[in-house]
UniProtKB/Swiss-Prot annotation:
Together with the chaperonin GroEL, plays an essential role in assisting protein folding. The GroEL-GroES system forms a nano-cage that allows encapsulation of the non-native substrate proteins and provides a physical environment optimized to promote and accelerate protein folding. GroES binds to the apical surface of the GroEL ring, thereby capping the opening of the GroEL channel. Induction: Induced in response to heat shock (45 degrees Celsius), pH 4, pH 10, ethanol, H(2)O(2), hyperosmolarity and starvation. The gene is groES. SMART domains: Cpn10. There is a cross-link at residue 100 (Isoglutamyl lysine isopeptide (Lys-Gln) (interchain with Q-Cter in protein Pup)). One of its GO terms (molecular function) is protein-folding chaperone binding. N-terminus is acetylated by RimI. GO terms for cellular component: cytosol; extracellular region; peptidoglycan-based cell wall; plasma membrane. It comes from Mycobacterium tuberculosis (strain ATCC 25618 / H37Rv). This is Co-chaperonin GroES. PROSITE patterns: CHAPERONINS_CPN10 (PS00681). Keywords: Acetylation, Chaperone, Cytoplasm, Isopeptide bond, Stress response, Ubl conjugation. One of its GO terms (biological process) is regulation of DNA-templated transcription.
Length: 100
């Protein structure tokens, strides 16, 4: 995973989606038009967290760079940077962190 010069703001997370499956368990090739949108990816960068209600301190995020996360199917904003595709998610769009 290459270093990216994108720094998310507040409680935003920059994720690079893992590749979608290209074949089924039985060996059938899945055409591009029928592929499911991936819901798992690797965290590339993390914002500093959002401010608490008093605006006095930041609330840290539960994820860190390098974590593998599962996120909402339709969450986030897709971007392209230096030929790579990324997703900017809100911390609320992250459903789970995958343990290694």
């Amino acid at each position: 995973m290459a270093k990216v010069n994108i720094k998310p703001l507040e409680d935003k997370i920059l994720v690079q989606a893992n590749e979608a499956e290209t074949t089924t368990a039985s060996g059938l090739v899945i055409p591009d038009t029928a592929k499911e949108k991936p819901q798992e990816g690797t965290v590339v960068a993390v914002g500093p967290g959002r401010w608490d209600e008093d605006g006095e301190k930041r609330i840290p995020l539960d994820v860190a760079e390098g974590d593998t996360v599962i996120y909402s199917k339709y969450g986030g904003t897709e971007i392209k940077y230096n030929g790579e595709e990324y997703l900017i998610l809100s911390a609320r769009d992250v459903l789970a962190v995958v343990s290694k």
